[in-house]
Amino acid sequence: MRNRWAMASRRPPDETAAPLVPEGGDLDALRAAAATCRACPLWKRGTQTVFGAGAPDARIVFVGEQPGHEEDLAGVPFVGPSGRLLDQALEAAGIERRLAYVTNVVKHFKWEPRGKR
């Protein structure tokens, strides 16, 4: 196991995502940029870009790690098992999902079943 302190003290990479973010920064421009992003190899295996969904002016935003299998196929975040759990939690809290915005940190991902590691 790597030393946690050694990992934390590493310099950040010289490259950033800043050049990939379009001028103006509205959600539609960002969605288009994500759809054509080739900055990392994840786009090669994903079925499609899974951007965000919901109210653009939402006061509540949920951010997951990466799309799951159902999200990859649908092109919409949080429609699989995690989405069903989120829906139950929102209902219990009295929050309408349409008032929230859901997205993932990673926009391209292809889930593959694997054996035990």
Sequence positions of predicted segments:
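A polyanion-binding, active-site-adjacent surface
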Residues: 2-117
